[in-house]
Structures are given as C-alpha cells and as structure tokens.
A protein has these predicted regions:
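Short, solvent-exposed loop/turn segments at secondary-structure junctions
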Residues: 16-19, 55-57, 77-79, 103-106, ...
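Structural preference for beta-strand elements that scaffold enzyme active sites
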Residues: 9-11, 69-71, 95-97
C-alpha cells in the first residue's frame, strides 16, 4: 500500500477510566469518568472520530480518512472499559478499538504492569518500597553491587515521577530477570495491596462473557 503521513491520524490510547477519588485506589494514575466525558466532548468538537474499519481500510486500501481523523483505543482489557467507557461511547454513537490481553482474562492472573501500578497507588512511602525491593533482590541472588549500578543507571526522574519511583518501575518492568521480577512483584503486591491475585484479576479485567458482549456492541 502507499505510504501515508502519520499526521493524518491521531491515536488516543486510554487505560484506566473510572471514579478514582474516594475509591479503594485513590492514588492510581487514571482518568476520572467526568474527565473522560470532557475529553470526548473536545474530540467530537475538534476531530473526526473514526472507526477501526476506517483505519483498516486506510492501511489496506489507502482509502482517505476524514480531516483531523482520530482513533480511540482502549488497552489492557480493563473492566473499566466495559463498565464505564463502552456505555459512554454507545450513548454518543462513537466507536473505539479494544485490545484485551488473553492471558489475564483466560488464566486469571494479573499483568506485572498492573501489579506495579497498584502497589504504587497503595503506598505513600516510595523509600520503603525501594528498600523492600532491594532486600528482596538480595534474597533472590542480585548482588548489592548490581543494585547500586541499576540505581545509578535507572533512577532518573522525569516529569511524571521522581527518581525512586522510576527506579522501582524499571526494576520490575524489565531490568531484573523475568523470574526474579515476577516473584518480587507478587510478594510486594500481597504485602502492600493485600488482595489475592486471582480475586484482583477478576475485579480488574473483563471476563470472557463481557468480552463477547463488547464484540457484539
């Protein structure tokens, strides 16, 4: 197919959409429902929200998209999307693309990234989290010298998080070997959040029936 300019399509990626203030996880970095509605108001006024079929036709057949085309995507299969986002889209006559992951929905587990998000949301002491992380690393065979090198390389603040938070995230996202980081994430989740992972998975992600209803909507 012919190449086309990325600027022809704006892609908006949504993750957590839910009532957050006053909820069980008030520290979670997500989008309040009222904020989602305001964003849709803005996008409907200033963009042409397109369907997945239009995007596919553009890619495969080079069919033109409308001016200021905008594609709404919803990642990770959260129950938020079924409970809050979908009814609002249907009410407005809008469509979006949903990308639920198979493993957490079918195997009743929690993705590491979601373990990390909720550990951080339930703690107001990042220094203690980093200390606990380092102690667990030592117990699982990571040397103190390695930890120091990792901290020097990855503890770099950005506009969203301080240095310790970035270090904590990076260590459990990709720096540590898979088996070690998976084990540490599970231990810290049980300690800090205190909800069995299987139960939490049922609460966080859509189930198979909800995915089927989503597809038929």
């Amino acid at each position: 197919y012919k190449e086309w300019q990325v600027t022809e399509l704006t892609i908006i990626m949504y993750h957590y959409i839910r009532p957050i203030v006053g909820s069980e996880f008030p520290g979670l970095k997500g989008l309040e429902m009222e904020g989602f509605k305001r964003q849709l108001d803005f996008l409907e006024t200033n963009y042409s929200i397109v369907s997945s079929e239009q995007v596919i036709d553009k890619i495969t057949k080079n069919k033109a998209l409308p001016p200021k085309a905008c594609w709404l995507t919803f990642d990770d299969g959260y129950k938020d999307h079924y409970q809050y986002a979908l009814p609002e889209l249907v009410n407005r006559g809008l469509s979006g693309a949903f990308f639920p992951p198979r493993v957490p929905i079918q195997e009743n587990v929690v993705l590491d990234v979601n373990l990390i998000h909720h550990i951080l949301s339930c703690s107001n002491d990042i220094n203690k989290l980093v200390t606990d992380l380092n102690h667990l690393c030592l117990q699982l065979g990571v040397t103190s010298e390695q930890i120091q090198e990792y901290y020097k390389e990855y503890a770099v603040a950005n506009r969203f998080d301080n240095a310790d938070t970035i270090f904590f995230k990076r260590m459990l996202q990709h720096v540590l070997p898979d088996q070690i980081r998976n084990e540490i994430a599970s231990i810290l989740f049980e300690k800090v959040v205190g909800i069995p992972e299987a139960e939490f998975s049922n609460r966080l992600y859509m189930n198979v029936d909800e995915v089927r209803k989503l597809v038929s909507s």
